[in-house]
Amino acid sequence: MSVLITGGYGLIGSELARMLVEKGEKVWVLDKWLVPQRFTGIEGKMTILQADLGNFSKILEAVKKSSPKAIFHLGGMLSLPSNADPQSAFATNVAGTYHVLEAARLFNILKVIFTSTIATYGLDIQKPVINDFTLQRPITMYGSTKVFCELLGRFYKTKYGIDFRAVRFPSVVGPGAKTAHISIYNAWAVEKAFYGEPYDIFVTPETRCPVLYFKDAARSLLLLEAAPAEAIQTVCYLLAGIKPMNSAAELVAAIRKHFPQAILNFKPDPLAMEFHSKSQGITYDDSLAEKEWGWKPEYSLEGMIANFYEELNRNPERYR
């Protein structure tokens, strides 16, 4: 049996592919943009498909060819690109997810694992705790597309019996991230310090943002996919990330344990701060993910940064 990963050349998708290859799975990777260095060391151990999620015929062809036991649907546009180009975000995120689910229905693929986001939360949050059932009223195009896709997945689950499961990721941190988004400073500050380059962090030192290391993000998808169907009651699961949630100042302090001379300055951006201000003072409760399928992150803030630098040292070609 095989598995299909959309967005397979991305930060999480490429790590997920590596993990699946190591498990002996037959892996098919689909992406619009191919980045060959992502798979250095495992070339030839996967089947690569180049396709746009907005092209239904290409998605049908990919699902028919791969005939996977499960589709990991990670492909899509992130927050800032989605807000800058909402039309493309609709075509990629909304129509693209419909194409994946409809292809799964047509070719009798019974399981779809979807990556959503905590950006589905926005207005009218009743602080101080957000959980899986908190009102989802996003303030961005990105968050809006993800709410729709969660609901579409639930519809396909109810009407067609597709075993749809989803996680709502916090900010995912890892080396080699290229696309700007509203919390990318958590990754770029770490990476710029490694390369000896200055970096302006676009939030205040006190700003707290939930983060999850990319290896934990990929591992969460494996755990969710492997859970027995009867355990999956909540369907769409919030992941809180590293606990306790660190501030931007604490991130910088942890980086400077490795690179004391790192040139990291704070230059808050009004748009970014408007977004982040709505989530300050909030605790994220992911206890149902732990209860229903055994979720628990392995990396602390310090462990994440140490492994981040280990990855950059061991695999420089993969992340540049």
At which residue positions do the language-model features occur?
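Conserved glycine-rich Rossmann-like NAD(P)H-binding loop of the short-chain dehydrogenase/reductase
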Residues: 25-36
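NAD(P)-dependent short-chain dehydrogenase/reductase
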Residues: 154-209, 214-222
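Active-site Tyr-X1-5-Lys
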Residues: 123-126, 137-165, 194
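C-terminal substrate-binding subdomain of Rossmann-fold SDR/epimerase-dehydratase oxidoreductases
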Residues: 202-204, 209-320
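N-terminal Rossmann NAD(P)H-binding glycine-rich loop of SDR-like oxidoreductase domains
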Residues: 3-23
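Rossmann-fold cofactor-recognition segment
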Residues: 43-55
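Conserved Rossmann-fold NAD(P)-dependent oxidoreductase catalytic core, especially the SDR/UDP-sugar
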Residues: 98-141
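NAD(P)H-binding glycine-rich loop region in Rossmannoid oxidoreductase-like domains
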Residues: 53-92
